[in-house]
A protein has these predicted regions:
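Glycine-rich flavin
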Residues: 2-4, 20-27, 32-166, 194, ...
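Short, acidic, Ser/Thr-enriched surface-loop or helix-capping motifs
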Residues: 110, 285-286, 388-390
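N-terminal Rossmann-fold NAD(P) dinucleotide-binding loop
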Residues: 15, 179-180
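FAD-site-proximal beta/loop scaffold in flavoenzymes
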Residues: 149-167, 249-322
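Flexible, glycine-rich terminal cap/loop adjacent to redox cofactors
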Residues: 7-35, 40, 47, 51-58, ...
Length: 445
């Protein structure tokens, strides 16, 4: 029996950041991981996807070469080199996490860990005991129960990241973040991309106006969208779906299922520890503690917010709670980004949410086409919406366009400090920068 102050199951962003924070504050930590350090985000999610998106962005710029005075520009897309660059990025960051797991106070154990009881974990036949346990096992791709889902040409985002060549025809089932990012990237790589989505609009967590404008912009680049369409079956290269009461089909060489993710709750021994959970995730309170005192669940596995940075900050919160330290993290101010081209980002409430909750709110817009830096960059397609209460306190910000994530991040900081629109008006912004778009929106109040 090995005793330690804190056990963490899972070495993704939530797990390894929690371990680092705890070790820096003098706790002995044992981290268990049955795959690769870094979790889904680093190995088969955020990071490799963003590497591909960057390649796609460069290709899009090359196609606009004549607008920059680059006449008769020629280039050849070598997807193998694109994949190799993506893998180098992943391996560099993974090496950094591996090094982090060797810092004083952290013991890193490779293998599948299960709870024996509320204080004991078993891995590789060895038992480990701690007064506090953090479960950070993440999530996996959710597969829809339809005929043909098990075909070799039907893949999840994990498998799509490892394809050796660009598919001539790619059908994406689902227009959430994963589906939209891959639609944007593979369209740039040369695929004929079709997206089939059950809902009325793409990116349901995004402001509906922003989501519609983004979809329309991506459509202009050749991506075909079928909204309010339910997939019925897959047979060979044929995807059959129903839309507006009519059955339709689309042909594809590769079919990506991007219908969301589900928490990894199986095979952890949660029942033995008496933890309340369901297939929708582990139930936690405001401190991310389960019904069993001393056992916490952070990140995708609690399904509160399936974002890597959400997992990290939930982990910081938990460690501070264990240490008895005050925690001022504003979890309700959770920015997110979609790295399509152009990209989109969001924080806080949308206009629709304000209306649904009966909140008197004011919304003002600022357009990229009126910004000097956007014009100089030839990135004039974009919009930023700023939403505030009648007293001026900022409730949300939603944008699409070049570097939208960076613009929304500024507003996230302001929201964490309960900044008002009038206070934002008094903050000097560098000229010419895209950040002036945020200020322009404030000046419209």
């Amino acid at each position: 029996m090995t005793k330690t102050d804190l056990i963490i199951i899972g070495a993704g962003p939530g797990g390894y950041r929690s371990a680092e924070h705890a070790a820096k504050h003098g706790l002995s930590v044992t981290v268990f991981e049955d795959k690769y350090a870094g979790g889904t985000c680093l190995n088969c999610g955020c990071i490799p996807t963003k590497a591909l998106c960057r390649n796609a962005e460069i290709i899009d710029s090359l196609r606009e070469g004549e607008e920059y005075g680059l006449d008769e520009l020629s280039y050849k897309i070598d997807f193998q080199k694109i994949a190799e660059r993506k893998q180098r990025v992943v391996e560099t960051l993974r090496s950094g996490v591996d090094t982090l797991m060797k810092m004083p106070g952290i013991t890193y154990v490779e293998g599948h860990a299960e709870l024996k009881d509320a204080r004991t974990v078993v891995c590789n036949g060895e038992e480990y005991e701690a007064q506090n346990i953090i479960i950070a096992t993440g999530s996996s791709a959710k597969m829809i129960p339809i005929p043909g889902i098990d075909q070799e040409n039907v893949v999840t985002s994990t498998e799509l990241l490892d394809v050796k060549e660009v598919p001539e025809r790619l059908c994406i089932v689902g227009a959430g973040v994963i589906g939209m990012e891959f639609a944007s990237a593979f369209s740039s790589f040369g695929s004929q991309v079709t997206v089939v989505e059950f809902l009325k609009e793409c990116l349901p967590t995004l402001d509906s106006d922003i989501a519609k404008r983004l979809r329309q912009q991506i459509s202009k680049r050749g991506v075909e969208f079928y909204m309010q369409a339910g997939v019925k079956a897959i047979s060979g290269n044929t995807v059959t779906f129903e839309r507006k009461g009519k059955e339709q089909t689309v042909e594809a060489d590769l079919i990506l299922i991007a219908t969301g993710r589900q928490p990894n709750v199986e095979g952890l021994g949660l029942e033995r520890a008496g933890i309340d959970f369901s297939k929708r995730g582990i139930q936690v309170d405001d401190n991310f503690q389960t019904n069993v005192p001393g056992i916490y669940a952070i990140g995708d596995v609690n399904a509160k917010c399936m974002l890597a940075h959400a997992a990290e900050f939930q982990g910081f919160h938990v460690v501070n709670h264990i240490l008895g330290k005050p925690c001022n993290i504003r979890h309700e101010v959770m920015p997110s980004a979609i790295f399509t081209h152009p990209e989109a980002a969001s924080v806080g409430m949308t206009e629709d949410q304000c209306k649904e909750q009966g909140i008197a709110a004011v919304c003002k817009k600022a357009f990229f086409r009126a910004n000097g830096k956007a014009l100089a960059m030839n990135e004039t397609e974009g919009l930023l919406k700023l939403i505030a209460r009648e007293d001026g306190r900022i409730l949300g910000c939603h944008a699409y366009g070049a570097h939208a994530a960076d613009l929304v991040q500024e507003v996230s900081v302001l929201m964490c400090r309960d900044t008002t629109v009038d206070e934002l008006k008094d903050m000097v912004h560098i000229h010419p920068t895209l950040s002036e778009i945020v200020h322009d929106a404030a000046m419209n109040f």
